[in-house]
């Protein structure tokens, strides 16, 4: 499951144009003209239509050099625990970037690219919305530049080469019950979560249990997004662990001779994609790891390129601060040698009411009908996210993403609570409805936060040489609010294996539900004293971290009874409806 199910929604019912109508009426600039001020020409760009391009490896190297002459102010956008409808994190990211440019600051935007699974599932297409969206929306949400297809092919090539070794070679004494590399598909399909393969007799391979995960959940996605260049990508691919021999020795991608062909398939996919916002701000849309399974941010290579084009980079981390932001700080910043200068925490009146009503599942009508008492009861969740972020030593600005049903009394209650009780900067944001005009106060607060920031104040939550359990327990108690951690027997065995393999000095990536600060999606607010249950651990050796599975997170979602796909169509002229 991915992030915000649908960012801010102002429908035609109240006279506001739909995202689709806004996108269709946008005055877009050809991508070659958009990028001309940075001396990026035909030799630097691979074009995918009139409004999308990939930057060549040489162009990225050039921009890395240019970045040394710029300020490199990094702004991370995250959020409180969202409702299933989403609170407008991407809208705020896009709107803030546009507004900084509106204020004559040179700003770039970097976000993740959508996965087809969620697009056709509960989310529908989205890359922002209203007057703070990234274009061309249809292309971005469908095949885009083919990155997800390349990743799917590369992932399944590894699986095929592993099974070929298993059935046609005695090179490895493979433990068929300890193969850790399933197949991948960029589509939500619950029937493929658990499969049995090799049932075609002697010529059909070795019978064994297998399964599928969503392409965005593949370790290859995390590897792509954490690689600095093609050479680094190849090295990371080579060390991915795909299974184990009966004596416990790991089998890597390099062991099955797949490093070269897999990297070959990803040669173009590692090149960052550049598009534009509705106001003409360049936007990198590249990579899409989930924040509840992997680290949840766009590619490092896109970030590094963006630093060469502007003094500000606005990027987002998936879900709430407990997931994407924590991993951005402890994994991405550590591996990418970056330090945020300010954090924008997106909150909304409806999310606060959602937590104040202690509601599961969400009932939007009941949320909208609730009063200020429910809003104030939900402050506990916002407070926890602010506290979480302050642990890293970075200035925090709360953005109250305003929806049409929000009253002045409600919005002011949130702003006053932030300013007076939490002592943090806060501003109302209407960038969905007004574009950059609706984000001026927020942008000014963020600029002030950047100017007051001191990189020396930044600190990781835990040292790299802490034990695996110490890292897990630090995140659980400091970020989630847990009182203790319980490890299953399998998890204990996995930890011992991680130690033996030498993975006890890498960051941990906790896989947890995004619906709650706890590992139970039903729990709202900010519970304390509860027990986090860790059921399994495995190494993402290529990415460079350990994944600890908690609760019941799925790597292959299923379509709902009424999927977004059912409302999509295309006419004889090729015009699409219902995508977003």
Swiss-Prot record:
This enzyme's EC code(s): 6.3.4.3
Superkingdom of origin: Archaea
Positions that bind ATP: 83-90
PROSITE patterns named among the record's database cross-references: FTHFS_1, FTHFS_2
Any single GO BP term: tetrahydrofolate interconversion
UniProt keyword terms in alphabetical order: ATP-binding, Ligase, Nucleotide-binding, One-carbon metabolism
Pathway: One-carbon metabolism; tetrahydrofolate interconversion
Enzyme class: ligase
Catalytic activity as recorded in UniProt: (6S)-5,6,7,8-tetrahydrofolate + formate + ATP = (6R)-10-formyltetrahydrofolate + ADP + phosphate
HAMAP family associated with the record: FTHFS (MF_01543)
Protein name in the entry: Formate--tetrahydrofolate ligase
Source organism (scientific name): Haloquadratum walsbyi (strain DSM 16790 / HBSQ001)
Lineage: Archaea, Methanobacteriati, Methanobacteriota, Stenosarchaea group, Halobacteria
């Amino acid at each position: 499951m991915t992030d915000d199910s649908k960012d801010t929604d102002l429908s035609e019912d109240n006279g506001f144009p739909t995202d689709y109508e806004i996108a269709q009426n946008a005055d877009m600039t050809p991508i070659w003209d958009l990028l001309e001020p940075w001396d990026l020409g035909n030799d630097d760009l691979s074009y995918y239509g009139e409004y999308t391009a990939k930057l060549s490896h040489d162009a990225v190297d050039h921009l890395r050099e240019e970045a040394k002459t710029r300020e490199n102010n990094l702004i991370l956008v995250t959020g409180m625990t969202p409702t299933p409808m989403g609170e407008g994190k991407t809208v705020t990211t896009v709107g803030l970037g546009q507004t900084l440019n509106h204020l004559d600051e040179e700003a770039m935007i970097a976000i993740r690219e959508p996965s087809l699974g969620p697009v056709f599932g509960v989310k529908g297409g989205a890359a922002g919305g209203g007057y703070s969206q990234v274009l061309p929306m249809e292309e971005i949400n469908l095949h885009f530049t083919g990155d997800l297809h390349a990743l799917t092919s590369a992932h399944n090539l590894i699986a095929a080469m592993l099974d070929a070794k298993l059935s046609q070679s005695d090179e490895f004494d493979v433990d068929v019950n300890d193969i850790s590399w399933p197949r991948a598909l960029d589509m939500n399909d619950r029937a493929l979560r658990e499969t049995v393969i090799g049932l075609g007799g002697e010529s059909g391979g070795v019978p064994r249990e297998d399964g599928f995960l969503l392409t965005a959940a593949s370790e290859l996605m995390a590897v792509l997004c954490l690689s600095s260049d093609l050479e680094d990508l190849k090295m990371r691919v080579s060390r991915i662990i795909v299974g184990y021999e009966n004596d416990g020795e790991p089998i890597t991608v390099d062991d099955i001779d797949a490093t070269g062909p897999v990297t070959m398939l990803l040669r173009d996919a590692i090149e960052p994609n550049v598009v534009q916002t509705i106001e003409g701000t360049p936007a990198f849309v590249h990579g899409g790891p989930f924040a509840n399974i992997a680290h949840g941010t766009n590619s490092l290579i896109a970030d590094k390129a963006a630093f060469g084009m502007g003094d500000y980079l606005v990027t987002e981390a998936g879900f709430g601060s407990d997931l994407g932001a924590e991993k951005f700080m402890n994994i991405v910043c550590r591996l990418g040698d970056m330090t945020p200068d300010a954090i924008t925490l997106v909150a909304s009146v409806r999310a606060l009411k959602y937590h104040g009503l202690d509601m599961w599942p969400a009932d939007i009508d009941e949320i909208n009908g609730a009063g200020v008492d429910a809003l104030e009861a939900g402050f506990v969740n916002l407070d926890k996210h602010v506290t979480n972020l302050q642990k890293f030593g970075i200035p925090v600005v709360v953005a109250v993403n305003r929806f049409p049903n929000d009253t002045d009394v409600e919005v002011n209650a949130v702003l006053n609570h932030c300013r007076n009780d939490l002592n943090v900067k806060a501003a109302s944001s209407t960038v969905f409805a007004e574009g950059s005009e609706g984000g001026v106060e927020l942008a000014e607060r963020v600029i002030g936060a950047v100017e007051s920031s001191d990189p020396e104040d930044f600190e990781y939550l835990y040292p790299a040489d802490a034990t695996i359990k110490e890292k897990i327990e630090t995140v659980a108690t400091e970020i989630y609010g847990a009182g203790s951690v319980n490890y299953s027997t399998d998890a204990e065995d996995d930890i011992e294996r991680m130690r033996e393999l030498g993975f006890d000095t890498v960051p941990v990536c906790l896989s947890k539900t995004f619906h709650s600060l706890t590992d139970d999606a039903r729990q709202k607010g900010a519970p304390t004293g509860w027990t986090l249950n860790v059921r399994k651990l495995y190494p993402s050796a290529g990415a460079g971290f350990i994944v600890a599975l908690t609760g019941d997170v799925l790597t292959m979602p299923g379509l709902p009874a009424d999927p977004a796909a059912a409302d999509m169509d295309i006419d004889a002229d090729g015009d699409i409806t219902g995508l977003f």
